């Protein structure tokens, strides 16, 4: 059976022909369970992002050397990002060689070890080493979870299910603020805040023991019987046969490519360069528009706005985190109904407005030199609006797009590389925010972020295609057409023998 791309399982043409085979978000309990289990990796990511913002307030109280050094504060925050950067870079290879399941189990072990080290840290420097371990686990998980969910999901609901991972990230941030608030009056405040983070890692490790490997990874590793058993838990018999035929066609195409894939290969093919530019660019702009500045330092920002109480700062930050989680729920719906590109653009326009409000409020606050007051509350409003606009769009879109724009053979490596770009960008922002705010002023810092958001709008318009509802094969065709023009016949499995020639053509571009 030969499948052309318009009739591939899950494509719009296929689902128009067989509407009874269309699946819904809640149509398969197995897929939901897999999504939530894999998404705990996102919860670890989110919890670590949020918990350090509150813990830092109390770490400064326990260690005078930390209180006296903005650089040391930034290092405690950003060392997890250094670990995540390394973990994400290695995570692509771990995913492709050992599989998505083993990569997740490895991430859980490393994260739990880091949580124990942080909770027991006798000084800031041991604490920093624990942050590095936690970051390694988060980095591997950030690569693995979106790809694992995407490869197990029907294409018609893939965007929403991958976005569930982002919901878990924002849910983890909200949970961290709840935990922060719960331990404010408990001896050893920050140790409890940081130590509790190991619990979700242990839970995910146990649950993942009962989860299968990605069916697409199994199929490409020639473990077809196992892959079919996994697919049978998702699809009924009629669509199952079509999905198997589609994977067989994809496998034949993969055989025409080089069996050993290296990082430099990504830059030798024009179509892969274009895909990586779009994916990595989205990841970079997600960070440089300031989201983790807000999440890492929101209690500190609230205190900068004139609200000096630790408890009040944490409470207002808890509201911001709750809005972030709620906004992500909205994004899960819209990402498969409005599309990735429109959602990202509307999100960025709102982010620009919010950052301008934050900038104006801090400029005025510095002129009046009063605590709290009108401009303090205006800053809190700006934070809230920022989250309202960012969470549904630029929160889930970069991770969703990166889980679906790369060919199977390159998905692990490209996903790892783009996630590394995210973590490097995250590190730069986290390590410099307080320093820039001290040197240039908080108002100017947010104005710079607004300017970067304007550049992000231009980037999305020019470089990011719409991938809503497309199969992996259809997405690949977009990059081939952008790289080489609209070549007649692309998309038929009978043309797979031409792949090697085109990749060689791309390497000379």
Curated annotation (Swiss-Prot):
Motif Di-Leu: positions: 502-503
The keyword Transcription regulation is annotated on this UniProt entry: no
Gene Ontology MF terms: myo-inositol:proton symporter activity
Annotated membrane topology: Multi-pass membrane protein
Knockout-associated phenotype: Reduced root length at low concentrations of myo-inositol.
Record keywords: Membrane, Symport, Transmembrane, Transmembrane helix, Transport, Vacuole
Keyword Transmembrane helix in record: yes
Location of the protein in the cell: Vacuole membrane
Tissue: Expressed in seedlings, leaves, flowers and pollen grains. Not detected in seeds.
Cystine bridges: none
PROSITE patterns: MFS, SUGAR_TRANSPORT_2
GO cellular component: cytosol; plant-type vacuole; plant-type vacuole membrane
Transmembrane residue ranges: 39-59, 74-94, 109-129, 132-152, 159-179, 192-212, 274-294, 315-335, 343-363, 374-394, 423-443, 444-464
GO biological process: myo-inositol transport
InterPro entries reported in the protein's UniProt record: MFS_dom (IPR020846), MFS_sugar_transport-like (IPR005828), MFS_trans_sf (IPR036259), Myo-inositol_Transporter (IPR050814), Sugar/inositol_transpt (IPR003663), Sugar_transporter_CS (IPR005829)
Note: The sorting of INT1 to the tonoplast is independent of the AP-3 adapter complex but is brefeldin A sensitive.
Family: Belongs to the major facilitator superfamily. Sugar transporter (TC 2.A.1.1) family.
PANTHER family tied to this protein: PROTON MYO-INOSITOL COTRANSPORTER (PTHR48020:SF12)
This protein's domain notes: The C-terminal domain (465-509) is necessary and sufficient for vacuole membrane targeting. The di-Leu motif is required for this sorting.
Function: Vacuolar inositol-proton symporter involved in the release of myo-inositol from vacuoles. Not involved in glucose or fructose transport.
Protein name as it appears in the record: Inositol transporter 1
Organism, as annotated: Arabidopsis thaliana (Mouse-ear cress)
Primary gene name: INT1
């Amino acid at each position: 059976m030969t499948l052309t791309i318009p009739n591939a399982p899950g494509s719009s043409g296929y689902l128009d022909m067989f509407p009874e085979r269309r699946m819904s978000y809640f149509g398969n309990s197995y897929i939901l369970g897999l999504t939530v289990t894999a998404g705990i990796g996102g919860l670890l990511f989110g919890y670590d992002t949020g918990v350090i913002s509150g813990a830092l307030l109390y770490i400064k109280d326990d260690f005078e050397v930390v209180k006296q050094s903005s650089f040391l504060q930034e290092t405690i925050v950003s060392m997890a990002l250094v670990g995540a950067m390394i973990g994400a870079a290695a995570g692509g290879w771990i995913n492709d060689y050992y599989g998505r399941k083993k990569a997740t189990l490895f991430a859980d072990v490393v994260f739990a070890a880091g949580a124990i080290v942080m909770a027991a840290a006798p000084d800031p420097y041991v604490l920093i080493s624990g942050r590095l371990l936690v970051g390694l686990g988060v980095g591997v998980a950030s690569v693995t979870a979106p790809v694992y969910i995407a490869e197990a999901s029907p294409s018609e609901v893939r965007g929403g299910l991958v976005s569930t991972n982002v919901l878990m990230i924002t849910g983890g941030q909200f949970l961290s603020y709840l935990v922060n608030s719960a331990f404010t009056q408990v001896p050893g405040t920050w140790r409890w805040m940081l130590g509790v983070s190991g619990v979700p890692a242990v839970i995910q490790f146990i649950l993942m023991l009962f989860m299968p490997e990605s069916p697409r990874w199994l199929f490409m590793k020639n473990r077809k019987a196992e892959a079919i058993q996994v697919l049978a838990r998702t699809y009924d018999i009629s669509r199952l046969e079509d999905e198997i035929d589609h994977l067989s066609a994809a496998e034949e195409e993969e055989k025409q490519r080089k069996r050993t894939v290296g990082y430099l290969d990504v830059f030798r093919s024009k179509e892969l360069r274009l895909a990586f530019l779009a994916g990595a660019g989205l990841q970079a702009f997600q960070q440089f528009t300031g989201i983790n500045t807000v999440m890492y330092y929101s209690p500190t920002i609230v205190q900068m706005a004139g609200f000096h109480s630790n408890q009040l700062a944490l409470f207002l930050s808890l509201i911001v985190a709750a809005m972030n989680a709620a906004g992500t729920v909205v994004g899960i719906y819209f990402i498969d109904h409005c599309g990735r590109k429109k959602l990202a653009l509307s999100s960025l326009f709102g982010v620009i407005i919010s950052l301008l409000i934050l900038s104006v409020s801090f400029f005025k606050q510095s002129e009046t030199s009063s605590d709290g007051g009108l401009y303090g509350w205006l800053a809190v409003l700006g934070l809230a609006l920022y989250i309202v606009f960012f969470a549904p769009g630029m929160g889930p879109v970069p991770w969703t797009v990166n889980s679906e724009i790369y060919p199977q053979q390159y998905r692990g490596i490209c996903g790892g590389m783009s996630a590394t770009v995210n973590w490097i960008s995250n590190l730069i922002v986290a390590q410099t925010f307080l320093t820039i705010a001290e040197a240039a002023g908080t108002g100017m810092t947010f104005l710079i972020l607004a300017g970067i958001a304007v550049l992000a709008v231009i980037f999305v318009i020019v470089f990011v295609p719409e991938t809503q509802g497309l199969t992996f094969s259809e997405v690949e065709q977009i990059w081939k057409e952008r790289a080489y023009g609209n070549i007649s016949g692309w998309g038929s499995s009978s043309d797979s023998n031409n792949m090697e020639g085109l990749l060689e053509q791309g390497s000379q571009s």
